[in-house]
Amino acid sequence: MTSTAPDNSRNRADALPKSWDPSAVEAEMYERWVSAGYFTADPASGKPAYSIVLPPPNVTGTLHMGHALDHTLMDTLARRKRMQGYEVLWLPGMDHAGIATQTVVEKQLAVDGKTKEDFGRELFVEKVWDWKRESGGAIQWQMRALGDGVDWSRDRFTMDEGLSRAVQTMFKRLYDAGLIYRAERLVNWSPELRTAISDIEVKHEDVEGELVSLRYGSLNDDEPHVVVATTRVETMLGDTAVAVHPDDPRYRDLIGTTLEHPITGRQIPIVADDYVDPEFGSGAVKITPAHDPNDFEIGLRHNLPMPTIMDERGRIANTGTEFDGMDRFEARVKVRERLAREGRVVAEKRPYIHSVGHSERTGEPIEPRLSMQWWVKVEALAKAAGDAVRNGQVVIHPASQEPRWFEWVDNMHDWTISRQLWWGHRIPIWYGPDGEVVCLGPGETPPEGWVQDPDVLDTWFSSGLWPFSTMGWPDATPELTKFYPTSVLVTGYDILFFWVARMMMFGMYVAEDPALTAGKDPGQVQVPFKDIFLHGLIRDQHGKKMSKSRGNGIDPLDWIRSYGADALRFTLARGAQPGGDLSVGEPHALASRSFVTKLFNATKFALLNGAAPGELPDRGSLTDADRWILDRLDEVLAEVDAAFDAYEFGKACEALYHFAWDELCDWYLELAKVQFAADGARAESTRTVLGTVLDAVLRLLHPVIPFVTESLWKALTGGESVVVAAWPTASGVTPDADAARRIADAQRLITEIRRFRSDQGLADKQKVSAKLIGVDSAELDALAPAIAALARLTEAGPDFAATASVEVRLSGATVTVELDTSGSVDLEAERKRLEKDLAAAQKELATTEGKLGNEAFLAKAPEQVVDKIRTRRDVAAAEVARIGARLAELGAR
């Protein structure tokens, strides 16, 4: 339509590009935000505080879709709170990732045929720092591409001097309190890395192994013997007992006796233990306390010897047998072969599918191994972490995750914190020449000649201090006074028990520290965060977990390049719900990009027609359409606020999507076109209403899709930046229920006319002569011009002859629609089209009914699949009926 807008609005429209090209504007726009200081937090501000610490990604890594989800949700929260008038600190940083980083650098050295030992510890650590300085910036660049509104002036790294000081302080406090100790216990051992690794670094995979049943004791059936089965036959070199259930009658007479070890010759006892399942296998279990976690516990209960039979590289050692020096997998074969030669192998099953823990870093099977390590005594720490949630000091969203939290913290085992690495926080323990041991805090110097413990701390130890160490603890700082406790932690439920638990334990341990309580309400407990929001895992569009082996992973940077950061962010936020997994694929990204494009085109149309926010005219002078869209805006604002406050990102995005697309663009913009063509006052008020609603929609959408909304909002309002614009608030006006009812009736009438037109074979844009009977009874007189325009109807002339009619039942009356399609439709062509459509519908009906009548299919198919087929069947049946009726109608002509 021809624009009646004033010239300045056309200038504002010209400020926008012809079409939205994210790659042309996003990078420059982001740097403008950073340069303007919008993301820099001011601890001296009088505004209420809102703070989030970014879960630190590994310095070795790049952002995957899980990171992109985390960052999108955190940025959404931070941007919204900033618009609501809060002083926002979103603090970024990276984790030094001990094992991962050391492995990367060692692999680089290996290319030149070098090892870390060739350089020595000090020089190797310096090489790691060099690598970090050269390669550590990739993640920051990716965060900028995503649009993360973080305070770059406070960027932290877990090996920074300040954070290292915090780590040493916490270690000494725990050590002095008797909560850190050294002991020989079973750990997950990586022979390739030659270090203990944490549970979270172990992934369990099904492998094709072997199950070997072997005979202890006499080879004569009438003399004492037992049969045990194992998937790791080499570990029998470290067996120190055979366990049976105390009530198993088969072994009652053997309990307390000994049998000769088939290879070492030592006598090993038969012990009774309730752990053994008498129904499984032979009911007898070989016990290798130094190389199996369950066997270790049995060994403790029965005071068994615990010889370690493998060295740090996974080679057999100290057994006094011909197998010493062999790799564990070679020994597995050789031990089995010897036992077979001696007639002790009773049965072999291969392949035998069983689950084996693998190192996430190297891919090798981990080896449970008895090792001297440093441990944290967690009982009191874990109780405090659990109580913080029980007492409501920390709230988990969704609440359905609370039982998992309590199950974990209430049953936590002591935590091994030492790692046999060179890169990381060195354990601050020194040993004297006569066996003395001292723990030193920051700034303390060891006596001359004392040697520091060679191990480093588990990465989770330093990242467990992240919420407060990043703000300057153990010093009292303005940041801690203003922004601690942090407002919310956003993370996936899959690491709830690892990183989150560590932060909670440490945070509660120092909750009464003067550095954290200074300037605070004495009654306020200094928890690390007030809320924990747990989202689910990202799956592909078919609901399968993303993994390298499946090849179904998505690089978020690829999506940013293809669809723009806004489309990526909207896809992730729209699918996010508390505790629930979300499935994403290209169709979702395309839909989000279409939404961004729709918003861009709608704003450009509004600008071309002079739309601008301003003081709204008196309600009495507004049309039903105006009052309806303004009232709906209030309703959607309330829905969006409630959803965001409850961390229901998906619900907020759905509300905004449907309001912006279905109601604002598809309905109000079309109604506005009719109003723009009216007299000057009506057109002007329409411009103000459209501008006001669009202004609010852009502000509401900004936290999720910041780039396009910034460009559009500045063009629409001429404001500085939507980043610092005020969050919309409710108008306080009582909604007009009558206007809403009339608009709903008009929408139903237009929709039914469009459907009826289609049934008559009319093209979408083809106008047709029509009569609407009963419009006055339905109170739609004022909307009649809009109904005619949107339904593509023209006024009936003197030659009007109705060829088809339909009755549309509305809320208070029935409107009859008569159409004159004579000369508008090629009846023969329409008949052929309908016959083709009928054949397709009949085929779909037959296919779906066939599946639903197949008992074998119904027995195997998932319920959701069957439901989808039922829906398809119902749709096909309705289509067959509708098309058949239309063909019958054509046959009567």
From Swiss-Prot:
Sequence motif 'KMSKS' region, residues: 545-549
InterPro entries xref list: aa-tRNA-synth_I_CS, aa-tRNA-synth_Ia, Anticodon_Ia_Val, M/V/L/I-tRNA-synth_anticd-bd, Rossmann-like_a/b/a_fold, tRNA-bd_arm, tRNAsynth_Ia_anticodon-bd, Val-tRNA_synth_C_sf
Enzyme class: ligase
EC assignment: 6.1.1.9
Annotated Gene3D superfamilies: HUPs, Isoleucyl-tRNA Synthetase, Domain 1, Valyl-tRNA synthetase, C-terminal domain, Valyl/Leucyl/Isoleucyl-tRNA synthetase, editing domain
Keyword Protein biosynthesis assigned: yes
Record remark on domains: ValRS has two distinct active sites: one for aminoacylation and one for editing. The misactivated threonine is translocated from the active site to the editing site. The C-terminal coiled-coil domain is crucial for aminoacylation activity.
Function: Catalyzes the attachment of valine to tRNA(Val). As ValRS can inadvertently accommodate and process structurally similar amino acids such as threonine, to avoid such errors, it has a 'posttransfer' editing activity that hydrolyzes mischarged Thr-tRNA(Val) in a tRNA-dependent manner.
Complex and partners: Monomer.
Entry protein name: Valine--tRNA ligase
Source organism phylogeny: Bacteria, Bacillati, Actinomycetota, Actinomycetes, Mycobacteriales
